């Protein structure tokens, strides 16, 4: 695909913990672009089936927009045509690392790329391709939620298994809503097997090498 003569591409990343309104913000940006008569494609990973298995992006408030379900990042390229102005991608943390090169390419083709996702997993570690997407983004919007314990600003996602904090060795991906997750601030975010008063070498072993 050749670069468009008009318009300027960019990458915007909307991130934050669960229940921060990331998908809602994504839907708002899509609707604004639609009013400007822009040609839009929306995508989400097929694995995200919390609220719908249909071809749509659904927020916690149950607002929705049409979307194409993808199994891998390269699937996006098969749908891109010269008239597309805007590409929207929800739940980007679930995608493979090819998404980094793909969104960079799309932005260089003068396409506006708007992405949402969790930048931290339930352990508080960088999640999937999100740290790289944040690094190459032209604009970053970091949203917060309300801590379920203190009522303060929450920037982390607490995983709960039968109402108790999860162990750090549990699978990173656990698709679900309030039955498994709640927003928490740094102070109240915890893991059952991690002592936060000590340097957390175990949790960040791969990142510190």
Swiss-Prot record:
GO terms for cellular component: cytosol. ATP binds at residues 16-23, 90-93. Pfam families: TK. Keywords: ATP-binding, Cytoplasm, DNA synthesis, Kinase, Nucleotide-binding, Transferase. One of its GO terms (biological process) is DNA biosynthetic process. It is found in: Cytoplasm. Gene3D superfamilies: 3.30.60.20, P-loop containing nucleotide triphosphate hydrolases (3.40.50.300). Its main location: cytoplasm. It catalyses: thymidine + ATP = dTMP + ADP + H(+). InterPro entries: P-loop_NTPase (IPR027417), Thymidine_kinase (IPR001267). The active site is at 91 (proton acceptor). One of its GO terms (molecular function) is ATP binding. It comes from the Bacteria. Signal peptide: none annotated. Its EC number is 2.7.1.21. NCBIfam families: PRK04296.1-1. Homotetramer. Belongs to the thymidine kinase family. This is Thymidine kinase. It comes from Aster yellows witches'-broom phytoplasma (strain AYWB). The lineage of its organism: Bacteria, Bacillati, Mycoplasmatota, Mollicutes, Acholeplasmatales.
